[in-house]
A protein has these predicted regions:
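Position-specific recognition of the canonical hydrophobic site in helix A of tetratricopeptide repeat
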Residues: 25, 59-60, 94, 128
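Canonical tetratricopeptide repeat
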Residues: 19, 53, 88, 122, ...
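Structural marker of alpha-solenoid helical repeat scaffolds
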Residues: 5-9, 43, 78, 112, ...
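Residue-level detector of the short coil/turn that links helix A to helix B
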Residues: 28, 62-63, 97, 131
Length: 169
C-alpha cells in the first residue's frame, strides 16, 4: 500500500518495485509482478537483476522469448560472472530450441555456480537433448546431491533412470 501512494517524481529507487515484484510473483500474482518489474526497468533500464528476473520469468511462462533473450544477453554483458544470470540466458536458448548454443552457456553457468541444483539440472537437460547422455546423467546426479526439494528430487531421479523428453516449443 505504501508503494502505491508514492508520487512518481519521488520514486528514485528501482529496488522498491523489484522487491515488490518478487513478492507478487511468489504470491502467484504475475500480472502485478510484471508491472512492477517493468516499472523498475523504467527507473533503471540497465539493472541486470531486474532484466534477469523479468526475462527468466517470461521464458519460464513461455512468453516473449525474443525480448527475453535480448534482455538476458544484456544482463550477461553487465554481469558476466553471475552464474544465475548466465544460466537464465542458457535456459532461454534451450527453451527457444537453440540446444547447441545453449550447452556452452549452461556449462559456463555450472562452472560459476557449482553448488546450484537447478543450474546443474538445466545443463543435464541440455546435454541429454544434444545426445550427450552420460554427461547428462552425471549432471543430474550432481543436481540430485544438491537438491532439498522432494518434488525436484523425484523428477531428477526419474531423469537419471529414464532420460529426458525435451519439451515442445
Amino acid at each position: 500500500k505504501v508503494i502505491d501512494n508514492i508520487e512518481e517524481e519521488n520514486v528514485r529507487d528501482w529496488i522498491i518495485y523489484y522487491t515488490r515484484g518478487i513478492v507478487f510473483d511468489q504470491e502467484k500474482r504475475w500480472a502485478e509482478a510484471e508491472m512492477d518489474f517493468k516499472k523498475a526497468l523504467e527507473i533503471r533500464p540497465e539493472q541486470p537483476m531486474v532484466l534477469n528476473y523479468l526475462a527468466y520469468s517470461w521464458v519460464d511462462r513461455g512468453l516473449n522469448y525474443v525480448e527475453a533473450k535480448k534482455m538476458l544477453i544484456r544482463a550477461v554483458e553487465l554481469r558476466p560472472n553471475d552464474g544465475y544470470i548466465v544460466d537464465s540466458l542458457g535456459w532461454a536458448l534451450y527453451k527457444m530450441g537453440d540446444y547447441e548454443e545453449a550447452v556452452p552457456v549452461l556449462e559456463r553457468a555450472a562452472q560459476l555456480e557449482t553448488q546450484d541444483w537447478a543450474i546443474n539440472d538445466h545443463l543435464g537437460d541440455a546435454y541429454w537433448t544434444v545426445g550427450r547422455k552420460n554427461e547428462a546423467r552425471f549432471q543430474w546426479r550432481h543436481a540430485l546431491s544438491l537438491s532439498r526439494d522432494e518434488d525436484k528430487i523425484d523428477l531428477i531421479k526419474s531423469k537419471i533412470k529414464d532420460g529426458y523428453t525435451k519439451p515442445e516449443i
